[in-house]
Structures are given as C-alpha cells and as structure tokens.
A protein has these predicted regions:
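Periplasmic solute-binding protein
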Residues: 1-16, 96-112, 193-202
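Extracytoplasmic/periplasmic substrate-recognition and gating elements
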Residues: 31, 35-41, 74-147
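Paired acidic/hydrophobic, glycine-rich loop segments that form the ligand-binding mouth/hinge
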Residues: 58-63, 82-84
Length: 240
C-alpha cells in the first residue's frame, strides 16, 4: 500500500464501492513490488532479527515497536543501528514521497453491555481517560521503568509519543514521520482486500507466475465481498 500511496493512487474508488486495483497503473505498482522478490532476489519469509543482527539484511521495514525486539534480542549491536522514514518515491518535482501505510488500532465500548448496566457515560469517560495524552504517557513511562526496554508501548496519540518514554533518538524520527502516515480506508468488506493482495503476492513470488494476471483474477473476490457487505448494511453499491 505504501507504494500505491507514494505514487498518488487510492485503493478504492471515490465512493468506496469497489477497488481501483483493476486499473493499469495500480497493477504496475503491484508488479514492481513483486519484482523486488522475483527479479532482485529478496526473500519474503525470513527471520528479520537474526538476519539483521548478522548484517545479512542491513535494511528492513517494520513498525516502530520493532525497536523493542532489537533492543532485547540483539544487545550486541546496541547503538549500532537507528531508524528512519520508509524508503520513498521520487516525484516529478524532485521531492521524495515517504507516505507509509498505517495500521489502525481501536478502543471501543460494547454498548449492549454498558447500557444494560447503566454505565454508558462511565464507560465513555473511562475511554477518554485511557486514550488521553497524560494517561498514555504515564503508562508507557511506568511500564518501561518496571519491565525495561522490552516494555516499549505503542501509545495512542502523538502527544503521548512526545512526552513518553521512547528514547530521544527514536522519538524525533517517529514524530517526524507522523505526517507521512496514511491509513487504509475501513469500509464494509475491506477485511478481504489485504488478504487477497497478500495471497496474490505469495502466489506470484512462490510460483513465479505473471503478477498482473494473478492479481486480476482475484479482484472479483474483493469487489463481490464489498458489494455483499454494502447490500447487507443498506448502502449503495458500484452497480447502482
């Protein structure tokens, strides 16, 4: 998804009723992605920690909580590595687009439970307290103080990152990339999109088959699931 976004493309059409992956430009992005593995020899299933600590893989892409893994499992290279923005795409004006696909985590209230107990307002107040900058910052600092480097906690907001226990050398980078993050739209049926793209990728790389054909034949599964879910919720579909 990062490669799609860096090239200015969107995963779904304007009203989120179908995927745009059937467009030639987006298919070429998928093809370029798979060719890192089929043509340039990258491995798609490796033990990143082991390969990184030995120098076999000098550069890897992951979420910032991977700092924990390296700090604990590879102490012998402590201070010899750092983090940076994801590799970007050069634009026509010479600038580099570092847009990175972001994962979404949520907190929620089970309404049927709290309404039954008459605790709706209290549940909402708790959720606001838990996700507040002060609570998240304090929790991350106290957790790290109690359990050490392994307890680095992915806090719920930017202010908590700024005030939390993340090392300054990492904090500066993490804060600088926040404006580059772009989340995948969460639409009815979208859970199948990532799964389908991943399956097409694995098939292409494992069987060394044509990436565009492999992706194309899977698109009906995405659009059909989106249509079915939108019909289930009484929403308009791409066919209307």
């Amino acid at each position: 998804l990062s490669m799609l976004y860096q090239n200015g493309y969107e995963l779904y059409n304007d009203d989120n009723t179908a995927t745009n992956l059937d467009q030639t430009e987006l298919m070429m992005v998928f093809k370029n992605w798979t060719e890192y593995y089929t043509n340039q020899g990258l491995e798609y299933s490796v033990n990143l920690t082991t390969r990184f600590r030995t120098g076999e893989i000098p550069l890897m892409v992951g979420d910032y909580t991977y700092i924990n893994t390296l700090s604990i499992s590879a102490p012998e290279i402590s201070g010899k590595w750092s983090i940076a923005k994801v590799p970007g795409t050069k634009k026509a004006d010479g600038s580099i687009d570092h847009t990175a696909a972001a994962m979404i985590g949520t907190s929620f209230i089970v309404s049927s439970t709290v309404e039954k107990d008459g605790m709706l307002n209290e549940a909402w107040d708790f959720l606001k307290w838990w996700t507040s900058a002060q609570t998240q910052s304090n929790y991350s600092i106290e957790l790290k103080a109690a359990d050490g480097e392994a307890a680095e906690y992915p806090v719920a907001n930017i202010a908590a990152i700024r005030d939390g226990g993340l090392k300054d050398e990492f904090k500066e980078v993490v804060l600088s990339l926040m404006d580059d993050l772009k989340a995948e739209p969460q639409i009815p049926g979208s859970y199948i999109t990532g799964r389908t793209i991943r399956n097409a990728f694995v098939t292409t790389v494992s069987d060394n088959v044509d990436p565009i054909d492999t992706l194309y034949i899977t698109l009906d599964a995405i659009n059909t699931e989106i249509m079915n879910k939108r019909q289930e919720f009484g929403l308009n579909t791409a066919q209307e």
